[in-house]
Amino acid sequence: MPMETGFTSPGPLIVQIGGFAVRWYSLLILAGIIAGTLLSQKLAPERKVAPEVLSDLVVWLVVGAIPMARLYYVLFEWQRFAGEPWWKVFAIWEGGIAIHGAILGGLLAGWLFCRRNGYSLLTMIDLAAPGLILGQAIGRWGNFFNSEAYGAPTNLPWKLFIPEANRPPGMAAFAYYHPTFLYESLWNLGVLALLLFVFFRFKNLRPGSIACLYALAYSVGRFWIEGLRLDSLMVGPLRTAQLVSLAGIVLGAVGLWWLNRRSARQEAP
């Protein structure tokens, strides 16, 4: 009998001692934050910003992003949390945050940081965008260990085994699913390569261009990948992430057009 191929999660826990547990999900979020911060610090001198400024900015971004990421998720999954103990709302270590909520919270915190310290918001989000997408690429692997954020059943060689307890209602007979976490992680690495190429190749771009390119490129991939998932956050019959991704595509494209048009006008004789 041929052996099955594909991914199988070893489980969400790295180690557990009594009631204390170290989870892959939390570790990968932390790793993503650290890697993203180091990358943005490395890029900062290219825009005449001191690397330590990025360290201060990241503290603000994390404080704004993580609570908003959880709040966003809980609001759209309220029927699930309404029947749980109240403390489950805050149990981020068990999984359940939304990147779009994190981006909204991070933007608000970044705006407050720049306003308070006199920095250009557009320059700062240009520096933060490559670090953010790197952090997303790393953090997505937390979904693998939690056996979540997967797609429709499949028999492809890179299929993902999902334990029966984590399968959707009515789909217990299907053991293997699309590893959408992997698709998004790889897409994010591609977006990172694009952002870094543009960042170093076109150094005279208007501030905000890298952030707009991030919004456009990430949203295109997220819209496609979200259509494969079975556990999307929903607004009625609509997938929330696809709606937000459409907005990201429009805002990113319009922002790039507006910045380039504005730049061309200023350079015209």
UniProtKB/Swiss-Prot annotation:
> Mainly localized where?
membrane
List the record's Gene Ontology CC terms alphabetically.
plasma membrane
Q: Which GO terms describe its biological process?
A: lipoprotein biosynthetic process
- The enzyme's first-digit EC class, named in words, is transferase
Which EC number(s) are documented for this chain?
A: 2.5.1.145
Identify the stretch annotated as signal peptide in this record: none
What InterPro entries does this protein map onto?
Lgt
Tell me the domain of life. Answer: Bacteria
Pathway linked to the protein? Protein modification; lipoprotein biosynthesis (diacylglyceryl transfer)
Give TM regions: 14-34, 49-69, 89-109, 118-138, 180-200, 208-228, 240-260
Q: How does it sit in the membrane?
A: Multi-pass membrane protein
Gene Ontology terms for molecular function:
phosphatidylglycerol-prolipoprotein diacylglyceryl transferase activity
| Keyword Nuclease assigned | no
Where does the UniProt annotation locate this protein?
A: Cell inner membrane
Keyword annotations of the record: Cell inner membrane, Cell membrane, Membrane, Transferase, Transmembrane, Transmembrane helix
Recorded hits in Pfam families, A to Z, give:
LGT
Q: Which residues bind a 1,2-diacyl-sn-glycero-3-phospho-(1'-sn-glycerol)?
A: 140
Q: Carries keyword Transferase? A: yes
Q: Which family does it belong to?
A: Belongs to the Lgt family.
Q: What does this protein do?
A: Catalyzes the transfer of the diacylglyceryl group from phosphatidylglycerol to the sulfhydryl group of the N-terminal cysteine of a prolipoprotein, the first step in the formation of mature lipoproteins.
NCBIfam families xref list? lgt
HAMAP family tied to this protein: Lgt
What is this protein's name? Phosphatidylglycerol--prolipoprotein diacylglyceryl transferase
Q: What is the lineage of its organism?
A: Bacteria, Bacillati, Cyanobacteriota, Cyanophyceae, Gloeobacterales
